[in-house]
Amino acid sequence: MREVISIHVGQAGIQIGNACWELFCLEHGIQPDGQMPSDKTIGGGDDAFNTFFSETGAEKHVPRCVFLDLEPTVIDEVRTGTYRQLFHPEQLISGKEDAANNFARGHYTIGKEIVDLCLDRIRKLADQCTGLQGFLVFNSVGGGTGSGLGSLLLERLSVDYGKKSKLGFTVYPSPQVSTAVVEPYNSVLSTHSLLEHTDVAVMLDNEAVYDICRRNLDIERPTYTNLNRLIAQVISSLTASLRFDGALNVDVTEFQTNLVPYPSVIIRPSTPAEKAYHEQLSVAEITNSAFEPASMMAKCDPRHGKYMACCLMYRGDVVPKDVNAAVATIKTKRTIQFVDWCPTGFKCGINYQPPTVVPSGDPAKVMRAVCMISNSTAIAEVFSRIDHKFDLMYAKRAFVHWYVGEGMEEGEFSEVREDLAALEKDYEEVGIEIVEGEGEEEGME
């Protein structure tokens, strides 16, 4: 088997986790108590779903996941919620006091006390796997636990499971909406770890997802439940090929191979868009709509950058012939630009399982959908926004004493800031080299 272990850190990670497992259970016909009635054998009784669920002797299906938080309130909601019987009590780990939106508390002081317990639980899950493929880590980088404990955990996972893939699904601070004053500090500090310790980091941004809910799903005032369910649809599409059989299945390691051109462009900021919901659209139409700026789940305009790589994950009633035609059309468009050293740039996956929707959920039931995950130079916009806010605060050393008081050194701030500046520069250079090349060609003509 090619098992995958999911790790949900902090409030955002846990709430996205709730939405994801709710959806996975519906997709596989697993009830909230973990039972899977035999008459609902989806996919003819194959065991592809065992990549995400382990089976106990009592025929109960238990998610291969761990929920971690430094304070109990959010995890208590899982302990008392609809799916309380689904999870093993040992998989829900909470501390006594929270990280107070402080990266240093999550990473150095309070996080340090709980991290060994977390790794112990992860080790138990890993021991149950016959061929562990990798980890999916869910967190946000604006708060204290997601950023601090999340990056500490990634560092430790790199040591213990060096060769395993690590995919991060990370919620970045939104341009306009802020939940904490110190968000820029936390995000820059934890991006440093994401760069070093994840293989692919998928960026999500509440404001962008909020806009999709409002514009595409006509929800006037989206709640976090709406946002999380939409994010869960995206994650479900990305992992569908691990859980179901399809025509062109995509492995976790294949994301890495296809999205990462060379190591300096490491954060592989993939901006996924889950498309199609209302009318029955053709494959070409859903493919085109996936490339629209309005579909991006991180606030950046892909028209300002160039694509280095792009994975298209189709599900439902889709045949390879239609996909090839749709991709050929995209390649002829002038608005969608690829870097010239990567002319093909497309990786496609097809899965025959159509998207499942949560009863009373927002998206309508559709026959086919596409989820795009891409590496584009436009993502530099996200970093420059965060960097700018970081610089404004750090110039005055505002709030720095809270971090130093928890055992951090001030030098760390400038070190991680330089790292991010280098990343921004990498993305810019990828774009610039190309412009020079185009100029030469015109000169020759």
Curated annotation (Swiss-Prot):
The modification N6-acetyllysine is found at residue 40. The active site is at 254. It is found in: Cytoplasm, Cytoskeleton. Its cofactor is Mg(2+). Mg(2+) binds at residue 71. Its main location: cytoplasm. GTP binds at residues 11, 71, 140, 144-145, 179, 206, 228. The keyword Transport does not apply. Keywords: Acetylation, Cytoplasm, Cytoskeleton, GTP-binding, Hydrolase, Magnesium, Metal-binding, Microtubule, Nucleotide-binding. Belongs to the tubulin family. Dimer of alpha and beta chains. A typical microtubule is a hollow water-filled tube with an outer diameter of 25 nm and an inner diameter of 15 nM. Alpha-beta heterodimers associate head-to-tail to form protofilaments running lengthwise along the microtubule wall with the beta-tubulin subunit facing the microtubule plus end conferring a structural polarity. Microtubules usually have 13 protofilaments but different protofilament numbers can be found in some organisms and specialized cells. This is Tubulin alpha-1 chain. It comes from Stylonychia lemnae (Ciliate).
